Amino acid sequence: MVDVNDVIHANEKAQIDFAQMLLPEGIRRDNNKMYEEVEIPPNEPMPIGFEEKAVFVSELDEIGQLVFKGMKRLNRIQSIVFETAYNTNENLLICAPTGAGKTNIAMLTILHEIRQHLQPGGVIRKDQFKIVYVAPMKALAAEMTNYFSKRLEPLGIAVKELTGDMQLTKGEILRTQMLVTTPEKWDVVTRKSVGDVALSQVVRLLILDEVHLLHEDRGPVLESLVARTLRQVESTQSMIRILGLSATLPNYLDVATFLHVNPFIGLFYFDSRFRPVPLGQSFVGIKTTNKVQQLHDMEEVCYEKVLKQIKAGHQVMVFVHARNSTVRTAMSLIEMAKNRGELSFFQVDQGADYGQCEKQIQRSRNKQMREMFPDGFGIHHAGMLRQDRSLMESMFSRGYLKVLVCTATLAWGVNLPAHAVIIKGTNIYDAKRGTLVDLGILDVMQIFGRAGRPQFDKYGEGTIITTHDKLSHYLTLLTQQNPIESQFQQSLADNLNAEIALGTVTNVDEAVRWLSYTYLYVRMRANPLAYGINHKAYQMDPQLELYRKELVVESGRKLDKARMIRFDERTGYFASTDLGRTASHFYIKYNTIESFNELFNAQNTEADVLSIVSKAEEFEQIKVRVQEEDADGKSSVQILCGSHHTNAARIMRALFEMALRKRWPAMTYRLLNLCKVMDKRLWGWAHPLRQFNTLPASALARMEDKNLTIDKLRDMGKDEIGHMLHHVNIGLKVKQCVHQIPAILLESSIQPITRTVLRVRLSITPDFRWNDQVHGSVGEPWWLWVEDPINDHIYHSEYFLLQKKQVVSGEPQQVVFTIPIFEPMPSQYYIRAVSDRWLGSEAVCIINFQHLILPERHPPHTELLDLQPLPITALGNREYESLYKFTHYNPIQTQIFHTLYHTDTNVLLGAPTGSGKTIAAEMAIFRVFNMYPTSKVVYIAPLKALVRERIEDWKIRIEEKLGRKVVELTGDNTPDMRAIAQADLIVTTPEKWDGVSRSWQNRSYVQKVAILIIDEIHLLGEDRGPVLEVIVSRTNFISSHTSKTVRVVGLSTALANARDLADWLGIGQVGLFNFRPSVRPVPLEVHIQGFPGQHYCPRMATMNKPVFQAIRTHSPAKPVLIFVSSRRQTRLTALDLIAFLATEDDPKQWLHQDEREMTDIIATIRESNLKLTLAFGIGMHHAGLHERDRKTVEELFVNCKIQVLIATSTLAWGVNFPAHLVIVKGTEYYDGKTRRYVDYPITDVLQMMGRAGRPQFDDQGKAVILVHDIKKDFYKKFLYEPFPVESSLLSVLSDHLNAEIAAGTVTSKQDAMDYITWTYFFRRLVMNPSYYNLDDISHETINKYLSNLVERSLRDLECSYCMEIQQDEQTIEPLTYGRISSYYYLKHQTIRMFKERLKPELPVHELLAILSLPCSDYGTDTKTVLDNAIRICQAMLDVVANEGWLVSALSLCNLVQMIIQARWLHDSSLLTLPHIQKQELYVFRRWSSRGVRAGCGHQGPIEGLPELIAACDGKEDIFTSMVKEVLQPNQISQ
């Protein structure tokens, strides 16, 4: 075990142990009773080397000259470094004294980076890079931002400050090329996980100023930054150059190793001889130990030193360490000078504008300043007013002050040199440790850096006055004899947590590897004793693997105890928790989280919360002044919090997230309000209009006195408001502000899905006026949660953004989510929406459960009987048996065999994916072949891909081997009537069969159907469900008319409400088989992981590492299928996985094929990204791939040549190749119609999971589902218990009614009512009335509900010119447009749009505009558009013909031809030939018949197809000779 604290103390001891001290030559020592002084004279400057030559600005290229304008040449150090900094991409470490011009070296590297993105013509590609400059203090960051902004302005490079004081929006960051930030801020930014356009991904140059800070308390932040950057460079394989700038340090080689600097190229070390103004140093140690005497002696020595400089005619700065000491020291120096009669030395000669200065001083409110000025003394500290500080700076630089007494802030923030500086005393109070500590070496160096003014002085002088016991400490430090050590162990736990939350460290081994990138590791190997590692241990473990592991495990245990991570010591895996992520994102320390865990609970009041916040470790630096006489600093924090503190706002946000995650509604609400109180610096009880700074305070005070709430003000007129406030003109302004406070209206509706789950649809309508100056230009963020007031629990919460455009247009935003409900039923829940930024801006909506009717309980599943497996010989037909490769049916098939093969009853089979339902369908097909050989079988599959799969299989097995005709009927493939009439088996999609069977009276083959097999019938509940519903209803309707029964077989996954579906299909006890989800042939193990984050893309990016981990854990060598939502995600996921593989020992571990063979295959692939991923054994599969690429990928995966396949969700349905492990990466997809991310139907997720487990190879399958954390509970519930199927017919009822009216089956309103009673919708309406917005199920109510429904649908159709109601108000007459709509399978709204937009004489381009309207969502998917375009054009043609418009009709005929031939009307007809593009047409134009044997039909150049046909005269060799130079042989043969 390692105790970190012991190590830290050992570390400190080892650092101060200086037995042998080497001092430079020429020093002078003075030892008397009062003090000992060591004086080091200034160094001689370094002689100029033989090869050194100065670099002149005029020699630089154009960009360099622009930036260094006004400078003649670079100084000595800059010239030495120039070549490496300006012309290479090497990492650099520059150690040089303060004031040596390191900032310009940084500028050289910046210019090198900019030049790499310079395009011909002088354009800089600004979006391709970011430069980050990390400065140690905010004051310095501001100074650097100004400096770089001015210098880079000619190049148009934007420089912005990003610190705690200066926040930037996402847009500002994107528009900025250079960010100047502090270590802590950049740490926070890079801790947030990387999104798509992640900031850290485009950083190309990282500049770290003052790297010697590694020694200080803030060193660990720098270490974690560099480690994170270096690991990112390795994992993404993209270069980030690192430049370290530091003061001269002894162990510069260690720092160079840590920054990965090549010591022979990128390491430059300049000692004090390179200072622009040499520095003389003197160290004074006061001998007495009596504290009072010590102070007195220090002042005495200080006075002597000051007087000596003043007599020599120099100005002096005296640095002290507390604000009140500045005045005290100045007064005592004046006092001494008076007593000794030497005050005249300090007083300034009164020059010309002295009087002016005196006036300025006298105007100041600072009494001490006014009193001291005449004596030539000034003071300066951060507690003074800005103008007073500036006044002191200008007086000192103009020479009107001889002595300036100041604190160290002057040395850091302001560039104000003096000939001599004196540091009086080196004890400063450190609030964290609660004691006095030594002044940090960094401050000393910075202060000494102010000694000597470059233009005026030959040398500068720095004096440090300390106690005698500290004398040697400062001597060693300032003569650079102490190596700088790492402080990383102090905050190892916090930094480890940040890496785990980011996902870059997931187990102990990775954490050990991560530590090897830190400075701690470099120093532990160089100086093991200082870190508590003895000689023997170091010899046994020279790489310190074991020691690093001990450190990691101990930190892991600490974090696990604080519930910030879950640490499984057996496997060594780390998993981040919500608490750990919150701590990392809000930069909260481990100790603070521990105290929160102890103190924070749901019952805390506001006062308790403030008290908890004030106990945070972040506030230790707040000290209580003696005058305040309060022993406890914590109450001081509370008071300061009340007046505002940056840390408090951050910690408050973290507490808010914790409360939200713990699901405490009252606490969440309270904390969100406190967060806003901190941000706005307004108490919650103040009037909300105080958030506007445009209204006068008097008016606001009156509103508070008269209790004029926002609601009251909304209802009042502007004049009334003016009178109430005794200020007539202000009414309008107040009214405008009232309407700009964000307000929303909430409306909710609920649908019970089961007895325990409700779906809530929430409509959010903005109710305020947008003003860019008040609201910005993006949107207003809100928090939304559903709370149960009785149990004090949040059942659902989410963050949403009201976009500016939604507010301006007033369009409502729809949010859909599910919540649990418990019995006994509560009376109500509340939906609460609270603005994230505005006080007093919230809305509440009540969900009332009084009229809620929950659906019936579901009957039990079918038990799987313990039967002897049935051999396939039971089919009794040799031909059928020969189709199967197995000998016996599986248990499910055995149990259903008799019903399917020996009876004609309707069957509903509910069984998990992968249990052999297709073979069950074949049993029913064979029954028809046996019993009704002249009838037809129709097999309906929901997707074209499924139809294709069945066709490919059955064309061989049923058509070739059994001699039965199999026909495909889809949008892609419409055979002629004769083929359909002769077919025995028709495989089709729901829409196509619906379109065909609509006119069943005229199509004899529809009446010959003996069996309808519907695959995936549970899709009834999805968007395309209504079509299935209509098909079955129509089939029943047809068989009732033709008195010939049609058998219906439904295949589905396990269902919750199978009984309802069975009743509707007319199935009694015999035909219903609904097995449990658990009776899969291969058992399935499911893991569900939740991921936080409101935004989709960054959330997907955070899932990539867990995907990689899951593959390594569950399926290191077996096939893996990863499902994602879009083509883009297939690419991003694949590229990230390759990046993770790159860090492994064997990056091609997923490729199970000889690399040379794979190279040959890759050569045939068209898609560039796929070429890259296949080389690593990762395939991609989506609709955008070329057919041949897709086939290649499928073959490689099925034959286990590649191990991982990343596919879009359609593959789950379309292709049957299972894998050992299935990963569902995210359960939402982008829905173009509603323009937002919506959830996959649960059936899709089950289908994807169903692909896990290969029946012949695996004894169990694995599925890993990665979801948005707020949906985790929902998926937990429904992935294990089946999901009930509801009807979706309501939304599209009008279109289906129209089809029946056009077909003549519905001729009156009563027929329409009867038609509805045939549907599944009618069954479910009675079973789950609340789902369909029906309040009760009495006969009367249902009748009324249905007649309203019919009336509404018919009215819609009438408005669309599809039908008309006769005068008796009952009879319905179809119109031409209704028939067109039905025949071409178009929505009635589309036909209405055609009727209103088509005109007599429309040219083609306007027709295209009309055609594109219904398909605007398919901007990218040309294929989807083309599937529908011809059908829609033909419908338009019918509409135009019906109106008798010839010009438009001809235009449409041209348009259809253009679409089918894929060319414009005026293009050459030769383009209809495959593979011929415009650029290849020249081969035809230049052809002539000379040289070809006589008798050729065409002589000259060929312009079109008829000429080509004549020229070739049916001879292939003539055609080949024409095109052989532009086409490959295989292309010619096509």
From Swiss-Prot:
What GO molecular functions are on record for this protein?
A: 3'-5' DNA helicase activity; ATP binding; ATP hydrolysis activity; nucleic acid binding; RNA helicase activity
A Pfam family reported for this protein in Swiss-Prot or TrEMBL: DEAD
Q: Where is the signal peptide?
A: none
Record's catalysed reaction(s): Couples ATP hydrolysis with the unwinding of duplex DNA by translocating in the 3'-5' direction; ATP + H2O = ADP + phosphate + H(+)
Name the keywords, alphabetized.
ATP-binding, Cytoplasm, DNA damage, DNA repair, Helicase, Hydrolase, Isomerase, Nucleotide-binding, Nucleus, Repeat
Query: What superkingdom does the record give?
Result: Eukaryota
**Family annotation (CDD domains):** DEXHc_ASCC3_1, DEXHc_ASCC3_2, SF2_C_Ski2
**Gene3D superfamilies annotated for this entry?**
5' to 3' exonuclease, C-terminal subdomain, C2 domain, P-loop containing nucleotide triphosphate hydrolases, Sec63 N-terminal domain-like domain, Winged helix-like DNA-binding domain superfamily/Winged helix DNA-binding domain
Q: Which sites bind ATP? A: 96-103, 911-918
Residues in SEC63 domain copies: 576-849, 1374-1481
Query: Which subcellular locations apply to this protein?
Result: Nucleus; Nucleus speckle; Cytoplasm, Cytosol
Motif extent (DEIH box): 1015-1018
Transmembrane feature ranges: none
Gene Ontology biological-process entries: DNA alkylation repair; rescue of stalled ribosome; ribosome disassembly; ribosome-associated ubiquitin-dependent protein catabolic process
Residues spanned by motif DEVH box: 209-212
Which residue ranges does the record assign to the Helicase ATP-binding domain?
83-267, 898-1073
Cellular component per GO?
A: cytosol; nuclear speck; nucleus
Task: State the family named in the UniProt similarity comment for this chain.
Answer: Belongs to the helicase family.
Give the protein's function. Answer: 3'-5' DNA helicase involved in repair of alkylated DNA. Promotes DNA unwinding to generate single-stranded substrate needed for alkbh3, enabling alkbh3 to process alkylated N3-methylcytosine (3mC) within double-stranded regions. Also involved in activation of the ribosome quality control (RQC) pathway, a pathway that degrades nascent peptide chains during problematic translation. Drives the splitting of stalled ribosomes.
Q: What is this protein called?
A: Activating signal cointegrator 1 complex subunit 3
Top-down, what is the taxonomic lineage of the species of origin? Answer: Eukaryota, Metazoa, Chordata, Craniata, Vertebrata
